[in-house]
Amino acid sequence: MNYKTEDIADGKEVFISGSFTFRDHDTFFEIISLLKTGSCKKLIFNLSGCDFIDSAGLGMFVIAHDEAESKSIELVIKGAQGKVRDVMLATRFDSLYTFEN
């Protein structure tokens, strides 16, 4: 997994590309640290470049949700496609995150 961040009006957009698996947990926790800054009110995970996610990757998104919920931060999944989108919807991530095309 690779990622880059961009500032948006009320938070950050994180562009995730490649495969997102258990071995990316240290990298993902760097991203979660963005939720701990007081100025972040919205965090968008742009998955348009993500081509695979395993169960550990899904679990990390649950951890991000729990952290964000405790701080009233809006979370968005943007651009998820193909099997990544299918597995996220099949596991009801649309009940945790707002999904955008």
Language model feature labels by segment:
Residues 17, 100-101:
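Short beta->alpha connector loops at strand-helix junctions that form conserved
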Residues 8-10, 48, 100:
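Conserved catalytic submotifs in the C-terminal HATPase_c
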Residues 2-30:
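STAS-typified acidic loop motif
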Residues 1-2, 101:
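Absolute protein N-terminus
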Residues 19-97:
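Amphipathic alpha-helical interaction surfaces in cytosolic regulatory modules
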